[in-house]
Every structure is written in structure tokens, then in C-alpha cells.
């Protein structure tokens, strides 16, 4: 893989190990330098105006560096074809790798939401609201950047009678919900929340972060608890919300199908 000089100079002779996790179109590699681990992330400039943009995520990491525990941004670079960033590995583990009780998992997700909600949204560099996400989704659809739909293996509760991405997109365009904007992670999962030995929470994969409705993150947490803990744990989480909005949760889970 040919790299820009500034990126190659930092990596030196280190071996790049592929580190593909999740469905992001970005390429991720880990490497060691002076007994420390780093990550190189690269995205095509085709995604520059989307939440998959590595430059977008790098700016978000920089903005969040004194607000949340996030990976340290080392450098960024962009040429005509790709966007690059190098981050330093954190000394923590994803909660997916920990043996947690349902109650512990619930407590971590609640604390994660509290940390995110504590961030003042003044001067937040990015918008991730419905307008932005629908525009992004239409770009993916028009450019055939989404995976083929497996008609035998998809969530019928979310898809209903829809057979195409465009059909689902049309529904979401016509039924958009009102928004109460907060700072949102945008992609909370058990592989994007890490815990260190002091039980401090770290956030990773912040490409979708920005101003969005509060129920974006709530819907993801409810789904994580329902799938990784139990239906009862998810219900307990919802019970402690000031005001649950099942319509919003359903809307944002549907919107997630278009990314």
C-alpha cells in the first residue's frame, strides 16, 4: 500500500496489520512504534461529505479531546484519493470483551449516555441530524454504496414490507420525527465503548458523532441491552427514562439500516 510521505515517515518500517471491524468502508491497520501501538485509518474521498469521512472523525476527536476520553489523535492527511489519520491505542478493553453481568452492562451504558449528554453543544463542529443523515443515505443509495439486501436475513420489524433501500428511505423522509438536539455518539455498540482498569469509559469510532436527537443514542443502547443482556434489562433502561418515545427509537433504528 502506497502512503503519503508524512504518514509513511511516522510508520517507518513497522508492519501494518489489518484491523477490520464492523461495516465501515474505511481501512484500519494497527502497527507498533517504539513499543507503543497505533492505528492508521484511511477512507476514500468519495465519503468526504459523509459520516464515514476519516477527516470528519479526526476533527471530532480533536474537539472532544478535553471533553471525553477518546483516542489521542496523532496526525491527519488528505490527498486526492484518500483521507488518513493516525491515532494512539488506548489502554482499555471493549465491553464486548468483558464478562459483565446484565446490571453492570446497564450501568455502563447509562453512564456513557450521561457523559455524552453532559457535553455542551455550543461550537460542536458537526451536525448529524435527520436532514444530514437522510441526505447521506440518499447519496449511498444513488451511488450503490450499500450492501445488497439479504431478503432471508433482515429485521422484518424494521423493514416491514420494504424490499429496497429507496423504499425505506422514502418512508423515513415522509415520516420524520421532531428533534431535540444533544451531543450524540451516533453509533453506540459494545465494540465502541471501552473500559480501562480504573473503570473509566472511553469512546471510539466517532465518525457519526455530532448534534442529533437524544433518541439516536437511546435507541442504540436499548437495542444493545436487548440483544446482549436481556429483554428485561432493556425494559429497565427504558423505565428510567424521563419520557420514552418508541416512535423515535423505531425511526432511528430504521435510519441506521441505511448506513
UniProtKB/Swiss-Prot annotation:
It catalyses: kanamycin A + ATP = kanamycin 3'-phosphate + ADP + H(+). Pfam families: APH. Keywords: Antibiotic resistance, ATP-binding, Kinase, Nucleotide-binding, Transferase. Coiled coil: none annotated. GO terms for biological process: response to antibiotic. It comes from the Bacteria. Its EC number is 2.7.1.95. GO terms for molecular function: ATP binding; kanamycin kinase activity. The active site is at residue 187. Gene3D superfamilies: 3.90.1200.10, Phosphorylase Kinase, domain 1. Belongs to the aminoglycoside phosphotransferase family. NCBIfam families: APH_3p, APH_3p_VI. Resistance to kanamycin and structurally-related aminoglycosides, including amikacin. This is Aminoglycoside 3'-phosphotransferase.
Amino acid at each position: 500500500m502506497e502512503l503519503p510521505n508524512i504518514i509513511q515517515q511516522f510508520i517507518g518500517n513497522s508492519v501494518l496489520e489489518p484491523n477490520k471491524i464492523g461495516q465501515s468502508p474505511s481501512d484500519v491497520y494497527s502497527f507498533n512504534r517504539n513499543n507503543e501501538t497505533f492505528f492508521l485509518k484511511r477512507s476514500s474521498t468519495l465519503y468526504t461529505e459523509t459520516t464515514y469521512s476519516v477527516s470528519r472523525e479526526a476533527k471530532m476527536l480533536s474537539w472532544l479531546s478535553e471533553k471525553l476520553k477518546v483516542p489521542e489523535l496523532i496526525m491527519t492527511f488528505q490527498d486526492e484519493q484518500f483521507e488518513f489519520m493516525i491515532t494512539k491505542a488506548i489502554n482499555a478493553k471493549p465491553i464486548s470483551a468483558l464478562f459483565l453481568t446484565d446490571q453492570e452492562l446497564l450501568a455502563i451504558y447509562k453512564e456513557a449516555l450521561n457523559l455524552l449528554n453532559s457535553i455542551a453543544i455550543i461550537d460542536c463542529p458537526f451536525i448529524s441530524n435527520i436532514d444530514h443523515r437522510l441526505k447521506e443515505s440518499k447519496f449511498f443509495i444513488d451511488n450503490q454504496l450499500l450492501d445488497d439486501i439479504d431478503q432471508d436475513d433482515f429485521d422484518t420489524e424494521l423493514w416491514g414490507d420494504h424490499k429496497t433501500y429507496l423504499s425505506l428511505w422514502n418512508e423515513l423522509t415522509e415520516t420524520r420525527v421532531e428533534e431535540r438536539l444533544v451531543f450524540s455518539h451516533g453509533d453506540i455498540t459494545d465494540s465502541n465503548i471501552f473500559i480501562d482498569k480504573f473503570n473509566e469509559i472511553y469512546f471510539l469510532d466517532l465518525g457519526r458523532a455530532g448534534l442529533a436527537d437524544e433518541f439516536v443514542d437511546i435507541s442504540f443502547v436499548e437495542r444493545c441491552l436487548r440483544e446482549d443482556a436481556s429483554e428485561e434489562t432493556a425494559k429497565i433502561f427504558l423505565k428510567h427514562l424521563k419520557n420514552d418515545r418508541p416512535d423515535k427509537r423505531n425511526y432511528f433504528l430504521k435510519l441506521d439500516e441505511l448506513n
